[in-house]
């Protein structure tokens, strides 16, 4: 369901919970997004054979150890991909923060860039807009560079040795 469809109910919920001008209404839905859950479930079904978990149980491994030793290492590529997708989507999100955050100190970069561009057309400084856009790209690049090694490990783990 598009965010715009559920926006009115979301804003009413945020107001009822008195969470306006707070980052919590932006963080919680990002963590528990249905698309992320679906992708992780699909990846787990395709990359994690149940026989591996059953073999660990037969060998006497507990649930916690099985998860940490078998499931989590196999899920690292999917977790990295979803972390990148979620970070980029929320870093570039304009709509939801514009509805929830009203204090100027709480504004996100997309809102700041939009405000810079919507200032007086003849007087706003395009150089300032471009510098702000350049600074907004750096965290995305850093997150990608940090998490890309897990994606490469996942691709290498699935390759066939010759």
State each model region's role.
Residues 1-162:
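A structural signal for multi-pass alpha-helical bundles of membrane permease subunits
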């Amino acid at each position: 369901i598009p965010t715009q469809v559920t926006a009115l109910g979301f804003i009413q919920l945020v107001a009822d919970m008195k969470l306006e001008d707070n980052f919590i209404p932006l963080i919680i839905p990002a963590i528990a997004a249905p698309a992320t859950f679906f992708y992780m479930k699909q990846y787990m079904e395709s990359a994690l054979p149940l026989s591996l978990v059953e073999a660990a149980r037969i060998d006497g491994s507990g649930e916690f150890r099985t998860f940490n030793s078998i499931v989590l290492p196999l899920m690292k590529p999917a977790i990295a991909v979803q972390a990148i997708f979620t970070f980029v989507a929320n870093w570039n999100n304009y709509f939801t923060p514009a509805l929830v955050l009203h204090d100027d100190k709480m504004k996100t970069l997309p809102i700041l860039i939009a405000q810079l561009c919507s200032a007086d057309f003849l007087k706003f400084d395009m150089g300032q807009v471009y510098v702000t856009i350049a600074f907004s790209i750096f965290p995305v690049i850093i997150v990608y560079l940090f998490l890309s090694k897990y994606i490469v490990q996942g691709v290498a783990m699935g390759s066939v040795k010759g």
